[in-house]
Amino acid sequence: MKNLFTLPLAALFFLFTAFTLKQDTPSQKLASVDVKGLDGKIINTGTFSNGGKPIVVSFWATWCAPCKKELNEIAEVYEEWQKETGVKVIAVSIDDARNSTKVKPYVEQQEWTYEIYLDENQDFKRSMNVNNVPHTFVLDGNLNVTWQTNVYNPNGGVEAIYSEVKKAAATTAAPAPENK
């Protein structure tokens, strides 16, 4: 009899908690700060675009094993993701100036086809409230953050990212309601 009341009560609690958390999550746009490309050119993150399609921004570092594992897993399915959703992945290294020379050789060795940027002074990291890496954001086509995670989960984490990419793609692709 006790279980008869406990289960519905627990379900109600989790539903209420999930609704409350979703409701209280503030909307966040992509910050606009300068970062450096691997070619040394400065670019403002506010100019990131993908033709109205989703963008994944992944903060990582060469010394972060979970970051590299996550980005390598994404690399294995990136072409498929692009075909299905048009997503663009942008990997932002937070290696400081002393270590940033390791980024380009590592990226070339891994043959990542992502856009790679250096956030040597960590302005972008701070403006996006990134406290640890890996920290991955999913943005809709309007550069609004729709989802984020700051952990690497080797058991389904990349699939969770892609699930959110598909949601962002569907939301962005949905036609705007007509005003009559």
Where are these regions (language model features)?
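N-terminal targeting signals for export/organelle localization
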Residues: M1-K36, W147-T149, G156, T171-K180
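A short beta-strand-turn-helix
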Residues: D34-I55
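Short pre-active-site segment immediately N-terminal to redox-active cysteine/selenocysteine motifs
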Residues: G52-I55, W60-W63, D96, N132
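Hydrophobic beta-strand anchors of alpha/beta hydrolase catalytic cores
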Residues: V56-V57, V89, T136
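Short, thiol/selenol-centered motifs that function as redox-active sites or metal-ligating centers
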Residues: C64-K68
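Structural microenvironment flanking redox-active thiols in thiol-disulfide oxidoreductases
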Residues: K69-Q110, N121-S127
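Thiol/disulfide oxidoreductase modules built on the thioredoxin-like
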Residues: Y106-W112, E120-K166
